[in-house]
Design a protein with these regions (language model features):
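Subset of outer-membrane beta-barrel
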Residues: 1-442
Length: 442
């Protein structure tokens, strides 16, 4: 979504349904597919070991996808020069962010045999994912030549939600008294879901139609059919001088209140498991091996009581902060007089952009430098360099064209890695088609 306080210089616009904005991105900090599967003579087990131990608990994996379903807007206000713009639309978003559960990974990879006495931190499990639709209406107001500000209200409808961010506890193996080892659990784990239980319970009549039924059910939740929430975006644009521009915005300052189809799974308590005694063939009990191991399984399951509750919960959106400062220069020179056109815009722009998004453990930051150039009257381009938690060598490129009243834009990141995407820690692509009706020149 754009800054709601961005300047708008057209009379009205309408997005081509399902094509006005398409965005997809995925990233993993600290590791790439190439690190695990490169044909470089290193054994896969060694590559896996390096990944398990080298990644930090603050490393993360993220996926984001957006699809604008409908969008539009129009200018209004002063009949001579409208100074307000009303925008509206509906879009779908998938967002998932999971921290690397380091102690869980080490325990799964190495087991506890070589980690006697080590305390495994169970709070390493931290992540959330959501599939939502967003209905929004915004108003942008141009106060004067220097200041423009705007607000956008949002109604969220949650299709699916998963959340596990407040886990606590530990696991440690020590030498035992009645057996070789004691396994000590101190558990306070919670996994919250909404929209999932009804999908799992969908009837399957044996014709492999579960997927079709699930899609149909999710479609019902797109507009006011799921758990609802409210959000707010606000932003501004300021020109301290003619060629300088400063912008700022806060987006998705909001929440979703989950009351429908809610299930929360909890595992709490302190437990000690002393392992099993060996089974000897002539123990005189008459118990078979299968019966013995079933008893062990039952005892272990009784030790851990997984509770399922249907308590309402609030899921806060991940707020986003954007800021930029830029400088424009180089007006078009007219051949007829070898002078600049007074009513033309600048051809070049350079600047810095800052982005931050709130996450459950700590914010995620990125900073970008960019150069913008109007190549032709109908085509402009933009080159960016971004440093963030994924990479320090992220170079992106974007193009925007205006042919007639149709605008098309496309932008991609991490161009240097496109020859082998497996090496990339992050990749993103966005594009869109919109119909724009310009202001009449006075």
């Amino acid at each position: 979504m754009l800054n709601p306080g961005a300047e708008v210089n057209y009379k009205w616009h309408v997005g081509i349904p399902l094509l006005s904005h398409i965005h997809a991105s995925a990233g993993a900090s600290g590791v790439s597919v190439y690190d695990l599967f490169a044909d470089n003579g290193v054994n896969f087990n060694e590559k896996l070991r390096r990944a398990v131990y080298n990644l930090d608990r603050n490393d993360y994996f993220t996926i984001n996808q957006q699809l604008e379903i409908i969008s539009g807007g129009f200018a209004y206000g002063n009949s001579y020069e409208p100074n307000k713009y009303l925008s509206f639309g509906l879009y779908q978003e998938l967002d998932a962010h999971v921290y690397y559960p380091k102690d869980y990974a080490i325990l799964a990879y190495k087991g506890n045999r070589d980690n006697i006495g080590r305390v495994f931190d169970l709070s390493d499990l931290n992540g959330k994912a959501e599939l939502i639709s967003v209905l929004h209406v915004g108003i942008t107001t141009k106060l004067n030549k220097k200041w423009t500000y705007g607000f956008r209200g949002k109604i969220y409808s949650s299709l699916l939600n998963f959340k596990s961010t407040n886990n606590k506890g530990s696991f440690v193996t020590t030498e035992g008294a009645n057996n070789f080892y004691n396994h000590n659990f101190d558990l306070d784990l919670e996994f919250q879901t909404s929209g999932l239980a009804s999908l799992v319970d969908l009837d399957n009549d044996g014709q492999n139609d579960w997927n079709a039924k699930a899609v149909k059910e999710l479609r019902k939740r797109v507009l006011f059919g799921g758990n609802l929430g409210l959000g707010l975006d606000f932003g501004f644009t300021y020109h301290p001088k003619e060629q300088w521009t400063v912008t700022g915005s806060v987006q998705d300052l909001g929440f979703i209140y989950h009351t429908k189809d809610v299930e929360t799974y909890t595992l709490k308590g302190q437990y000690t498991f002393e392992g099993v005694n060996p089974l000897f063939p002539n123990n005189g009990s008459g118990q078979t091996a299968d019966e013995y191991w079933q008893e062990i399984t039952d005892n272990f399951e009784d030790l851990f009581q997984l509770d399922t509750i249907t308590k309402n919960y609030v899921a806060w959106r991940s707020p986003k902060l954007n800021g930029s400062a830029s400088y424009k220069y180089g007006k078009k020179v007219l051949k007829e007089c070898n002078c600049t056109a007074d009513d033309s815009d600048y051809l070049n722009e350079v600047g810095l952009q800052l982005f931050a998004i709130g996450r459950s453990r700590r914010p995620q930051f990125s900073v970008s430098a960019f150069y913008y150039r109007r190549l032709f009257s109908f085509l402009s381009g933009k080159i960016t360099y971004t440093a963030d938690g994924f990479s320090k060598t992220n170079v992106g490129i974007g193009l925007s064209s205006h042919i007639g009243n149709v605008n098309f834009y496309i932008m991609a990141d991490n161009l240097f890695e496109y020859q082998n995407l497996a090496k990339a820690n992050y990749a993103s692509l966005q594009l869109g088609f919109n119909y724009i009706f310009p202001m009449e020149k006075k």
